[in-house]
């Protein structure tokens, strides 16, 4: 039986755990850091079958996972911990020879684990080099994962795709370049990667609820023309952009010619059912097969019910391709759709 260490957004681990229980017959699920990390087993499902199934249809709230190949008591002693990490790394053998290896070290708050992520990484990297591997930060063939709780140390090695994310704990980090107007921009950047949907493949986007322009700025940077709809002002840096048209009206008040856009994005904080009504009414302004990236606000802490209701409502006009709680989501999830 294989055990996996898993991560969800803070406060959403109970929902990720429930997804796992529903998906995996016979699984055993146990919490680690309250509300954020937990373990589960493959239960009655063969490991390769399970991984293939989870990759094909990712759970909404499970952000990251890795197989636990060794579990040991955590120690606050640097020498003891370093010895344990090096001993595990020595077991990797042929797996890492001539391979690019990312080493990701995380710890729960208040864990006695004595190293920061860089120090822990260095202990393992030394052995990886001795085995003929190349430690890297990105584009790895293998990922060595280390996660320390208050009592236990979990370590394992797996491919990036089997982790569901190649970022530590499934938490991508983007540089806040000068062109990034708001933190909301990171949400769209993460969606682009999570959905494997290069934004520069589109030509004209409709951004509903665009102010102050976080998502609009990303789309403009990718070379798109953008029609931004919001009664509020956009960031001054965007006002004179030649590919931006800003319509200062509510999204419910606008209309366009059919097929005007090949991408719709919407990050409005309104009631999600009201947002759905607006987006569905605007479906005809999208070309056939156009994509939409839409934030779904989770109301009243009933995420499964909210997602079920909203995907049904959007399903009248759109094919639902993926729903995922991104690292940059809070009380919400992000959905990728295609116009029918």
Question: What annotation goes with each model-predicted range?
Answer:
Residues 1-340:
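SAM-dependent transferase fold signal centered on methyltransferase-like domains
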């Amino acid at each position: 039986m294989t055990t996996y260490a898993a991560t969800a957004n803070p406060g959403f681990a109970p929902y990720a755990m429930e997804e796992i229980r529903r998906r995996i017959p016979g699984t055993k699920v146990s919490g680690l850091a309250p509300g954020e990390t937990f373990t589960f087993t493959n239960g009655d499902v063969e490991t390769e079958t399970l991984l293939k199934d989870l990759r094909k249809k990712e759970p909404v709230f499970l952000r990251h996972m890795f197989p636990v190949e060794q579990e040991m008591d955590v120690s606050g002693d640097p020498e003891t911990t370093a010895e344990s990490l090096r001993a595990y790394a020595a077991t990797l053998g042929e797996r890492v020879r001539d391979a690019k290896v990312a080493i990701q070290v995380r710890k729960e708050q208040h864990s006695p684990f004595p190293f920061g992520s860089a120090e822990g990484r260095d202990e393992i990297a030394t052995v990886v080099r001795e085995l003929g591997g190349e430690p890297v930060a990105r584009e790895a063939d293998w990922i060595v994962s280390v996660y320390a709780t208050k009592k236990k140390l979990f370590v394992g090695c797996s491919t990036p795709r089997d982790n569901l994310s190649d970022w530590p704990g499934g938490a991508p980090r983007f540089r806040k370049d000068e062109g990034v107007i708001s933190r909301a921009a990171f949400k769209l950047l993460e969606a682009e990667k999570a959905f494997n949907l290069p934004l520069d493949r589109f030509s004209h986007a409709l951004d509903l609820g665009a102010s102050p322009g976080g998502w609009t700025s990303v789309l403009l940077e990718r070379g798109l023309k953008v029609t931004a709809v919001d009664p509020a002002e956009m960031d001054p840096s965007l006002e004179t952009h030649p590919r931006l048209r800003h319509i200062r009206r509510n999204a419910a008040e606008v209309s366009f010619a059919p097929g005007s856009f090949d991408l719709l994005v919407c990050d409005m904080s309104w009631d999600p059912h009201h947002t759905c009504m607006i987006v569905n009414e605007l479906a005809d302004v999208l070309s056939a097969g156009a994509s939409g990236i839409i934030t779904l606000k989770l109301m009243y802490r009933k995420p499964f019910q909210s997602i079920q209701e909203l995907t049904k409502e959007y399903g009248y006009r759109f094919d639902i391709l993926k729903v995922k709680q991104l690292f940059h989501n809070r009380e919400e999830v992000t959905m990728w759709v295609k116009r029918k």
